[in-house]
UniProtKB/Swiss-Prot annotation:
Originating gene: nuoK
Enzyme class (EC, first level): translocase
NCBIfam families cross-referenced by the UniProt entry: PRK05715.1-1, PRK05715.1-2
The protein, known as: NADH-quinone oxidoreductase subunit K
Functional description taken from the UniProt entry: NDH-1 shuttles electrons from NADH, via FMN and iron-sulfur (Fe-S) centers, to quinones in the respiratory chain. The immediate electron acceptor for the enzyme in this species is believed to be ubiquinone. Couples the redox reaction to proton translocation (for every two electrons transferred, four hydrogen ions are translocated across the cytoplasmic membrane), and thus conserves the redox energy in a proton gradient.
Keyword Ribosomal protein assigned: no
Length: 102
């Protein structure tokens, strides 16, 4: 019943994770950094689902639900921070956040 071999699914998850990591390191726009984090979290969730389906265990799907709920919380908090940074500095550049003073 397994349509996707374990190696192929983990390879796709690894490629997605690496793409998210490259986007995280290269981009300076905080919106793109948040999108890269989402890609990385979805890659980890895909790895959980693929590994769980390999051994016919529902644990992968349970972890997927956990990762999706964490991603939703991360996105809402990240977008709130993004809006505050834009209101204060009128830019979405990450380097502007290093100029914040307490």
């Amino acid at each position: 019943m397994n349509a996707i071999p374990l190696e192929h699914g983990l390879a796709v998850a690894g490629v997605l994770f690496c793409l998210g990591l490259v986007g995280l390191m290269v981009r300076r726009n905080i919106l793109f950094v948040l999108m890269s984090l989402e890609i990385m979290m979805n890659a980890a969730a895909l790895a959980f689902v693929v590994a769980g389906s390999r051994w016919a265990q529902p644990d992968g799907q349970v972890m997927f639900i956990l990762v999706i709920s964490l991603a939703a919380a991360e996105a809402s908090i990240g977008l709130a921070i993004l809006m505050q940074l834009y209101r204060r500095f009128h830019t979405l550049d990450i380097d502007a956040a290093s100029e914040m003073r307490g």
